Amino acid sequence: MASWFRSKKFVEAKYKEAKENLLTKYGELGFRDAIIVADSVVPHNEQDVNIYISIEEGQKYYIRNIEWVGNTLYPTDVLNKLLQMKKGDVYNQTLMNERLMTDEDAVGNLYYNNGYVFSRIDPVETNIVGDSIDLEMRIFEGPQARISHVRISGNDRVYENVIRRELRNKPGDLFSREAL
């Protein structure tokens, strides 16, 4: 815990954040049910405090199966390759969410870069047997979006036509986050 408290002063808000970070870290290690069952901050002397945290880790979980539902545009093997998680891997919800939506080469970006800005991927735990979790990735692809208008403002030194010429996204094109 000491690495989370760099300041010399105990701050309640940072302590709460540190406890959340601790549980997140447990989740990344496969302990999705980890909870803090007790914690206390006890003054040691006038300058220091002792922090006691009792954690119930619960079961460590692994991925048993990953099934994709609703993917009509891209085959399952392409989505699995982008997800980079497979049977037997430690169940890491943080990594899964990053691989689905936030990483540069995430599954969601495959859809976004091809105009599917309204797409959504909902990971659902469908079955838990012992230490194994079955996942169902529910994809709602939605309609493709096109760029209807590009507004340019604040250009004092460069003519608008020069800026428009350099744009990769033009009106009528499919939306692509990558091309922005």
Q: Which functions belong to the PLM regions below?
A:
Residues M1-L180:
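Interaction-mediating elements
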